[in-house]
């Protein structure tokens, strides 16, 4: 029997849409802070660039999933790409740091709407027997965008300035809009109106797991370089992030269908275990061998955890609610990053860098515990339903 095709035209378009959106976001994330500082902006304003876009995206993602259930992906994407294009066209007209901070809300809106809707459509359009593989490939596009966006933005900025960065971003936005216009997707969703619901209750246990596991994610960017500097480690840590990204990309390429074959839980538990161990290693005074081991473990854990958990949620959610469930899980990823940056930052400031990474490890361990307990309850419920 021939295996069902994985990369259909619809899924290919979703990969291109999500990849394009993330290239735009990462390109601007790498260059706007430099431009804002050059205009005399403060560090607080630089921080607000990211806080504004992340907060807007986090609020929208759970809602977007429900809208896709009700209206269909394409009808949800169209206003999202309109906001994105309008924002990209307004960026060259911004007069100062405060204007750029305000416009980041538009980028957060575009990212939250388009990336979430594209992910829901991938889950809807992929064969059930290869859903884990399809979602791993989808999130591979995000990892590749992270590898491409910042270098592209910095290269253009160095050679031609911020206005050229805006032009490149607007060009990519136009391509994204064209892809959405020709996207073949159901015109309407299947879910009836259920009133305003910001989150899906079925997805809450998985969402709580994501929040816990993601508590330490921002710390590897915010505090690891400072920890290395304070510990006397010489040289740039750029290699750490390159190795980390390579492990994510390699993991999603080589292990993309693993959970379809052996089961979701058998992939999720080792993935979160590796994540926990990586933070414990990072809590030690930074040395090159330990940092390399941590990058490999964390990259492998990140590669497999979220796509597999998302596939598990989709497996267990009625078709009419899958968009809402996926949106809830997607929003929890941003929530974990926001809460984690505050919690780990407070711990680092009041105690030490090591304590901050131990906090990240405790969060990941709490997520692992929550997942295992939830899975046991699901197993008990299934046995009782079957009368076993």
Regions from the language model: what does each represent?
Residues 60-72, 251-263:
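Helix-to-loop junctions at the C-terminal end of transmembrane segments
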Residues 54-62, 146-147, 248-249, 253, ...:
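Residue-level signature of mid-helix packing/kink "hotspots" within the transmembrane helices
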Residues 170-189, 370-375:
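C-terminal membrane-cytosol helix-exit motif in multi-pass small-molecule transporters
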Residues 72, 93-95, 263, 284-286:
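Helix-breaking motifs and short loop linkers at transmembrane-helix boundaries and internal kinks
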Residues 98-104, 206, 290-295:
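Short hydrophobic/alpha-helical segments at membrane-entry points of transmembrane helices
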Residues 105-140:
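Cytoplasmic helix-loop-helix junction between adjacent transmembrane helices
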Residues 75-89, 170, 266-280:
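Structural signature of the two symmetry-related core transmembrane helices
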């Amino acid at each position: 029997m021939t295996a069902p095709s994985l990369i259909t035209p619809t899924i290919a378009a979703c990969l291109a849409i999500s990849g394009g959106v993330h290239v735009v976001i990462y390109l601007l994330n790498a260059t706007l802070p430099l431009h804002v500082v050059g205009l005399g902006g403060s560090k607080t304003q630089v921080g607000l660039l990211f806080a504004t876009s992340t907060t807007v995206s986090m609020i929208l993602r759970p809602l977007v999933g429900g809208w896709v259930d009700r209206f269909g992906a394409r009808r949800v994407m169209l206003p999202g790409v309109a906001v994105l294009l309008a924002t990209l066209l307004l960026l060259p007209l911004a007069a100062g740091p405060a204007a750029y901070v305000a416009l980041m809300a538009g980028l957060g809106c575009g990212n939250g709407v388009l990336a979430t809707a594209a992910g829901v459509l991938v889950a809807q359009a992929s064969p059930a027997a290869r859903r884990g593989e399809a979602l791993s490939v989808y999130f591979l596009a995000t990892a590749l965008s992270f590898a491409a966006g910042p270098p592209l933005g910095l290269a253009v900025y160095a050679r031609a300035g911020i206005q050229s960065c805006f032009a490149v971003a607007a060009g990519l936005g136009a391509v994204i809009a064209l892809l959405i216009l020709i996207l073949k997707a159901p015109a309407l969703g299947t879910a009836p109106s259920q009133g305003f619901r910001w989150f899906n209750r079925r997805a809450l246990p998985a969402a709580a797991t994501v929040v816990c596991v993601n508590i330490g994610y921002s710390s590897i960017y915010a505090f690891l370089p400072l920890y290395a500097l304070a510990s006397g480690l010489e040289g740039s840590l750029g290699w750490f992030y390159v190795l980390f990204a390579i492990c994510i990309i390699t993991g999603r390429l080589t292990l993309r269908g693993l959970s379809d074959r052996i089961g979701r839980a058998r992939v999720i538990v080792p993935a979160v275990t590796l994540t926990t161990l990586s933070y414990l290693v990072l809590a030690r005074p930074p040395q090159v061998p330990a940092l390399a081991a941590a990058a490999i473990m964390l990259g492998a854990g990140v590669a497999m955890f979220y796509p597999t958990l998302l596939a598990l949620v989709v497996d267990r959610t009625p078709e009419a609610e899958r968009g809402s469930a996926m949106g809830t899980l997607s929003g929890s990823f941003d929530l974990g990053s926001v809460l984690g940056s505050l919690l780990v930052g407070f711990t680092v400031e009041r105690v030490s860098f090591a304590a901050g990474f131990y906090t990240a490890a405790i969060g990941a361990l709490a997520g692992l515990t929550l997942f295992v307990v939830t899975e046991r309850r699901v197993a008990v419920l299934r046995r009782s339903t079957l009368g076993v």
